Amino acid sequence: MTTDSASNGNGSAQQPSPSLNILAQYVKDLSFENPGAPRSLQARDRSPAININVNVNANPLAENDFDVVLSLSAQAKDGDKMLFNVELAYGGVFRVAGFPQEHMLPLLFIECPRLLFPFARQIVADATRNGGFPPLMIDPIDFAQMFAQRMAEEKVRAQVANTNDTAN
């Protein structure tokens, strides 16, 4: 005789095992500017200064579905002259189920962007290569450190807001 429900040995139903699924990945916004072309494509004596910015945002879509957007921007300059500017917002729709509530923010702001990053990195590399420059291969990003820094900044903001509220 078989039963259709899983149990943990004491007759009660088990919680479903935690799962993280990617339902979709997409380019939300992509921009590449090469304002000095074709002069910017000429050989130069030194490497350009490259400034890279990274941001992650997450928004709920449904009970267990979330839209996570990894934003990457990079500017290359030779002195004060802009060589290129690339901006990418790369999103993923994730289904997150069976995780304790205290694990949700780390999942959304560390694990989800970690899964999106290789694809976003390739898009940026292709855009810079297609713009006439060597492909920009962004180094791996420590999303755990970014998340910790973000949480620390939000804690400070909350403390300042509480101090301002009690002072009024």
UniProtKB/Swiss-Prot annotation:
The lineage of its organism: Bacteria, Pseudomonadati, Pseudomonadota, Alphaproteobacteria, Hyphomicrobiales. GO terms for molecular function: unfolded protein binding. It is found in: Cytoplasm. One of the proteins required for the normal export of preproteins out of the cell cytoplasm. It is a molecular chaperone that binds to a subset of precursor proteins, maintaining them in a translocation-competent state. It also specifically binds to its receptor SecA. One of its GO terms (cellular component) is cytoplasm. Homotetramer, a dimer of dimers. One homotetramer interacts with 1 SecA dimer. It holds the Pfam family SecB. InterPro entries: SecB, SecB-like_sf. Keywords: Chaperone, Cytoplasm, Protein transport, Translocation, Transport. Gene3D superfamilies: SecB-like. Belongs to the SecB family. PANTHER family: PROTEIN-EXPORT PROTEIN SECB, PTHR36918. This is Protein-export protein SecB. One of its GO terms (biological process) is protein folding.
